[in-house]
């Protein structure tokens, strides 16, 4: 058996790679690990999902695995990933399980496990769970020792009370378009923004199990741009399928990505004395423009590998208060143990109201260098990335760029892709060099 856990839990095409049998085994193995690491006593796991059709099947299988090993399953239903992380701590549960493939297409699904307090698992714990999956379930409890299933009727309301803490001023007078990606934020996202006082125009908020992320949400911004312009809104916020991301568009329909959002929030927190050690944590994918803006403001930037788990690790290690990714995963440990798209949207709007400035004006503190990202589908990521022809193409591009840009080649942790990213002083050079490297990757893969 190959490694199950990727950079963001276990993912695959539902009912093909990620089967009900595997979901049951993961539930049982996670329960076994908990028993072996915490000793005797009744244990509880929070279980949530996004609305994709396969989630019902996988939820049932995960819960069967948990209860078969004596763990009570607290079922919270369709809620964002950060809600499950928060509720794991709020309910004083032993761990949490989220069934979602985030921004991936509908046929995919995934299983993400949170430890106590809603924190992501470390590699050692994931390895232990994998070894228990391989070993099989072992002895099972019987009678009253079998776990029970409890529906948490107040889960959404608890989460909404939590996210309301992100909004330190009323948003009355602000008009926002919210793209829910037909995903987990479809109910709670608009409710959160309305509760804060904003006038909300919701789009793509009618999930049917099949339409999640379908030409909508944070990976397809055409609809929200059009809606912002059509309604004369102050901004738009777009979430992905599990609502751990937030991207924005300003009143002109222009993108405000995760880098620009981090700059806006970092400056706000620095002004309020809330930016711990005057430090922002981000990944190698962040635009050079972010680094320049932060340097000008006297903010340090700590850089990690790609993936919010690495951002989270650095935040915890340094006791920092803000980090994130260009893709819109923004983490504020004071407001949650993982990225929360709704919290991010509320903080962004709070800054607009507090300053009286438009989103375009706030985001203008960062000047984005032209950046081109090409996703290349490959059969073998390791072989393609290491191919001499690919390395030669990268060397040629780096020679041309010199110190005026950079190139990054990164295998995806969740999909059969290699991401080619090029930043350059002008758009033409970025496109040309990215295409030349992507062509080499495609030929090698």
UniProtKB/Swiss-Prot annotation:
- Enzyme Commission number, as recorded: 5.4.2.10
Q: Which GO terms describe its molecular function?
A: magnesium ion binding; phosphoglucosamine mutase activity; phosphomannomutase activity
For this protein, the record's CDD domains field holds: GlmM (cd05802)
The signal peptide annotation in the UniProt record is: none
**Modified how:** Activated by phosphorylation.
From which organism does this entry originate?
A: Mycobacterium ulcerans (strain Agy99)
Q: Which reaction does it catalyse?
A: alpha-D-glucosamine 1-phosphate = D-glucosamine 6-phosphate
Per UniProt, Mg(2+) binds at 102, 240, 242, 244
> What is the similarity comment for this entry?
Belongs to the phosphohexose mutase family.
Q: What class of enzyme is it?
A: isomerase
The answer to whether UniProt assigns keyword Ribonucleoprotein to this entry is no
Catalytic-site annotation from UniProt: 102
Which UniProt keywords are present, listed alphabetically? Isomerase, Magnesium, Metal-binding, Phosphoprotein
Cofactor descriptive note = Binds 1 Mg(2+) ion per subunit.
Q: Which residues carry this modification: Phosphoserine?
A: 102
InterPro entries in the record: A-D-PHexomutase_a/b/a-I, A-D-PHexomutase_a/b/a-I/II/III, A-D-PHexomutase_a/b/a-II, A-D-PHexomutase_a/b/a-III, A-D-PHexomutase_C, A-D-PHexomutase_C_sf, A-D-PHexomutase_CS, Alpha-D-phosphohexomutase_SF
SUPFAM superfamilies registered for this protein in UniProt = Phosphoglucomutase, C-terminal domain (SSF55957), Phosphoglucomutase, first 3 domains (SSF53738)
Name by which UniProt lists this protein: Phosphoglucosamine mutase
Q: Where are the transmembrane segments?
A: none
Q: Name one GO cellular component term.
A: cytosol
| HAMAP family xrefs | GlmM_B
Give cofactor(s), names only: Mg(2+)
Picking any one GO biological process from the record gives: UDP-N-acetylglucosamine biosynthetic process
Per the entry, what this protein does is: Catalyzes the conversion of glucosamine-6-phosphate to glucosamine-1-phosphate.
């Amino acid at each position: 058996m190959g490694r199950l856990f990727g950079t963001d839990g276990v993912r695959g095409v539902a009912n093909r790679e990620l089967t009900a049998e595997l979901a049951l085994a993961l539930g049982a193995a996670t329960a076994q690990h908990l028993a072996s690491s915490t000793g005797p006593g009744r244990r509880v796991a929070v279980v949530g999902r996004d609305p994709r059709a396969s989630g019902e099947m996988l939820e049932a299988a995960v819960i069967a695995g948990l209860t078969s090993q004596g763990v009570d399953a607290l079922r919270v239903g369709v809620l964002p990933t950060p809600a499950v992380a928060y509720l794991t701590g709020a309910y004083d549960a032993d761990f949490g399980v989220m069934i979602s493939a985030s921004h991936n297409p509908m046929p995919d699904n995934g299983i993400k496990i949170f430890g106590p307090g809603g924190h992501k698992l470390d590699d050692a714990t994931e390895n232990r769970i994998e070894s228990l999956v391989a070993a099989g379930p072992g002895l099972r409890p019987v009678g009253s020792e079998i776990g029970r299933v409890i529906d948490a009727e107040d889960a959404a309301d608890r989460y909404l009370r939590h996210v309301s803490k992100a909004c330190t001023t009323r948003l009355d007078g602000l008009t926002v378009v919210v793209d829910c990606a037909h995903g987990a934020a479809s109910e709670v996202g608009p409710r959160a923004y309305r509760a804060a006082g904003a006038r909300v125009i919701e789009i793509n908020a009618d999930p049917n199990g099949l339409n999640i992320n379908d030409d909508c949400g944070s990976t397809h911004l055409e609809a929200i741009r059009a809606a912002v312009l059509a309604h004369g809104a102050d901004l738009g916020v777009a979430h992905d399928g599990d609502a751990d991301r937030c991207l924005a568009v300003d009143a002109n329909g222009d993108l405000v990505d995760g880098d620009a959002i981090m700059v806006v929030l970092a400056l706000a927190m620095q002004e309020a004395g809330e930016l711990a050690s005057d430090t922002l944590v981000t990944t190698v994918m962040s635009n050079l423009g972010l680094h320049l803006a932060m340097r000008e403001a006297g903010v340090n930037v700590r850089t990690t590998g790609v993936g919010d788990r690495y951002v989270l690790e650095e935040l915890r290690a340094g006791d920092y208060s803000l980090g994130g990714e260009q893709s819109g995963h923004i983490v504020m440990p004071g407001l949650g143990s993982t990225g929360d798209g709704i919290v991010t949207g509320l903080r962004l709007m709070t800054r607009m109201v507090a300053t009286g400035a438009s989103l375009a004006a706030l985001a203008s503190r960062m000047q984005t260098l032209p950046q081109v990202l090409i996703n290349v589908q490959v059969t073998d990521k390791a072989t393609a990335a290491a191919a001499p022809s690919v390395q030669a193409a990268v060397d040629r591009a780096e020679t041309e760029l010199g110190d005026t840009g950079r190139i990054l080649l990164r295998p995806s942790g969740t999909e059969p892709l290699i991401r080619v990213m090029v930043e350059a002083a002008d758009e033409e050079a970025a496109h040309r060099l990215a295409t030349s490297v992507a062509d080499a990757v495609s030929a090698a893969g």
